[in-house]
Swiss-Prot record:
Belongs to the LysR transcriptional regulatory family. Keywords: Activator, DNA-binding, Transcription, Transcription regulation. This is HTH-type transcriptional activator AllS. Residues 21-40 bind DNA. The keyword Transcription applies. GO terms for molecular function: DNA binding; DNA-binding transcription factor activity.
Length: 270
């Protein structure tokens, strides 16, 4: 409709934001008479008063406040549309969903990645999900995600996907220096280990077979939801188990954890 053309809406928003016809005129490089005429025409066409005028100020009416919110949204959409259309023409997706392995999820790293992505692709919406073990594959295969960081294994689980190596995770068997096993002489036997619970993270897969974490036959297991809780449980001495080397080396250096030479029969890989 002509009464809601972009030029009229920008005039209305300027008057609302400055609270003055004359200041809006200066901002838009128009005469005060032009601004006043546009607002009067807009009010006549809508059939409602958008401003309450006094000798000192111009205030929005309830209808004016509603139009202001809508006008800002419309103008934002109009201003961004050329860039959005160009991005679509270049083959850039409007929505990109990325799933990240719990072991590799770092809030600061994700924030830096988002800063780069949003600058490079300003009109794309990004959705990040944090999953555990086979939950990464599960999300990638079944939940409309197009990229995964840190999938398990070296082969894709679908023909239309490609896997690129990031490296292997080295695991260390650790415990609190206050844990009873810390006083035992290396190497620890399975019989000694079985007396204390293993702390493991629950696999978040819902449709794929869950990964079996390290636990000896007959050993009690404590299951936690994420790597942060697993680390905290080790620090508190409530259980034993494996942690990624880069994560636990600083804690070992600080004397908060100790590493044992125990190695499982089947090497841990991730």
């Amino acid at each position: 409709m002509a009464m809601l053309d972009p030029e009229t809406l920008r005039t209305f928003v300027s008057v609302a934001e400055t609270g003055s016809f004359s200041r809006a005129a200066e901002k838009l490089y128009k005469t005060t008479a032009t601004i006043s005429y546009r607002i009067k025409l807009l009010e006549d066409n809508t059939g409602v008063a958008l401003f309450s005028r006094t000798t000192r100020s111009v205030l929005l009416t309830p209808a004016g406040m509603h139009l202001l919110a809508q006008a800002r949204e419309w103008l934002g959409w109009i201003d961004s549309m050329p860039g959005e259309l160009q991005q679509i023409n270049d083959g850039v997706e409007r929505q990109v969903n990325i799933v990240v392995n719990n072991l590799m999820y770092d809030p600061q790293a994700i924030a830096r990645l988002l800063a780069w992505l949003t600058q490079r692709y300003p009109f794309t919406q990004f959705h990040f999900s944090r999953q555990i073990y086979m939950g990464v594959w599960d999300t990638l295969l079944h939940d409309d995600f197009s990229l995964a960081i840190g999938v398990t294994g070296t082969e894709p689980l679908a023909e239309n996907m490609a896997v690129y190596p990031l490296g292997e995770v080295t695991w260390l068997f650790v415990m609190s220096p206050h844990h009873p096993l810390s006083q035992q002489t290396d190497p620890l036997s399975e019989a000694q280990l079985r007396r204390y619970p293993a702390v493991n993270i629950e696999d978040s897969a819902r449709r794929l077979t869950k990964r079996v974490a390290w636990r000896l036959p007959g050993q009690k297991e404590i299951v936690v939801p994420d790597i942060e809780t697993k680390v905290a449980a080790h620090l508190a001495g409530v259980g034993i188990g494996f942690l990624p080397e880069p994560l636990c080396l600083p804690l070992i250096a600080q004397g908060k954890l100790i590493a044992d030479t125990f190695r499982p029969c089947v090497p841990l890989r991730h």
